[in-house]
């Protein structure tokens, strides 16, 4: 069909309207100025420059001393307060050490050097705050995208506008072209393209139709969508992103904990060394001023400021970057564990495959007792509350065939075994071949030999039929598996509860040579533990309830975004985009973060060692010591902030190909 100019304009109008309604972030300059430490650091810098100009132009000494002292107050009051609070808690931190060094510089008449120290120290602190703020704001800004109101469709078909926060699971809402989606849900009717870059990082709108999942805060395109709310507003993907970032910021990495453990001892040792540098030369008749100058220089250059900033900013930046691209990482500890991955263990259904299996065959054991239609009806009734992809496929096929699905009660899913429920007065079970304990069934052999997945339907404990289901490999599976193999010490291993034939069929197509099939959940745990006992750091990737125990046992675990709730809670990370190629990418990003941490620690240690040796065995000028020490701190902070950029994500994705 050819669109007229009017039709083209109408089709594009919603996206134009959305661009005006979505809140734009502050400009870079305004965002910087909103950080308190940036404002004080700027004031300190201006006062320092004013004092320097006055000093160089021969102004009265009282003038430039006053300006430098004002610089002390503007740039140093925050650090002085933090240091005092630490001292009250019987701790010694770098803030107090820097203030002590600056005061010492004033005491020996080196107010210029002390003011320079204050300015650079305040600047490095502001950079750290900017990194932390940007890490949080890059993700928390998503909350601003969630609309305040929603249009609920009531039982009589009328519409009512309510607050989005009042929506409950099961509510039906309508989203018109250009509107933002008010809650996580599923499409009941309608079709449209949804711009979900704010959640998944996808650059192009994604086609949505009946049954597809949508996220709160994403933007509807040119069609009208009728949705059912599937998550409470407090549990939407957007809300979980914010919660996970907050948790990640509060959870310190192992490297950071080690640094903090030795920081107190190091600081006390440094103070003792500074006192020794003062007392010992004076005992041998040295002049006070040069002794104090050397000691103050030592205190400045030996302070572990850059070491303290070396670890957490890069890790938190990596977490924020991953979150912007649809991967939620729950803590800095997880980033370190992902970087250590030496083997990836993959589930099959819903992870390596699309997770949208299709019911291929319905085989009643005795058509005179239960025909194919009744068999599928009972199976769908038992599975209608299931979260497993196989269960959803059975229900979907029954609906496609127009079969009325009766209500069921007392539903229970047994991981790795199947489900059972009471359908009317009938006790219906859907069992896997591995958990089935009845007489051998001839109907299983052709299904299993073809690589299909079989499900046995039992009525009151007696087998009445066999269902055959097939699944499709994810489009990016082959490339992703190859990338994982290239990144890790060992190629990926496939862990599945499915039969060996089905597992090997999928594995061969994906390029996997190590397959462990027909595993119950506890057997998956055993395989993971055996791999780790052999020296591997296992990353488990899965989506089903039966993957949760193995995820808990693995070194790290990532859940595919369409997975069951228990799996999402157990995993260390979640891929919202539900795309397998994000797994090698997040491993690559974690390794980038680890390299940045290593480089930062090397930079910090090198600067400290060189400057300390120069001061002890040479004549290190105090201004040069200040610039060298604080310059390394600024350099470390800026290096960590590199991981916030899209370029870092693209580099990780390229390395994973």
From Swiss-Prot:
GO cellular component, one term: plasma membrane
EC number: 7.2.2.-
CDD domains with a match to the protein in the record: P-type_ATPase_HM_ZosA_PfeT-like
Class of the enzyme per the UniProt entry, highest EC level: translocase
Transmembrane intervals: 40-60, 62-82, 101-121, 268-288, 299-319, 596-618
Membrane topology: Multi-pass membrane protein
Family according to the record: Belongs to the cation transport ATPase (P-type) (TC 3.A.3) family. Type IB subfamily.
Chain's role: Involved in heavy metal homeostasis. Probably exports nickel and cobalt ions out of the cell.
PANTHER family (alphabetical): CADMIUM_ZINC-TRANSPORTING ATPASE HMA1, CHLOROPLASTIC-RELATED, PROBABLE CADMIUM/ZINC-TRANSPORTING ATPASE HMA1
Protein name per its UniProtKB record: Probable cobalt/nickel-exporting P-type ATPase
Organism: Mycobacterium tuberculosis (strain CDC 1551 / Oshkosh)
This protein's encoding gene: ctpD
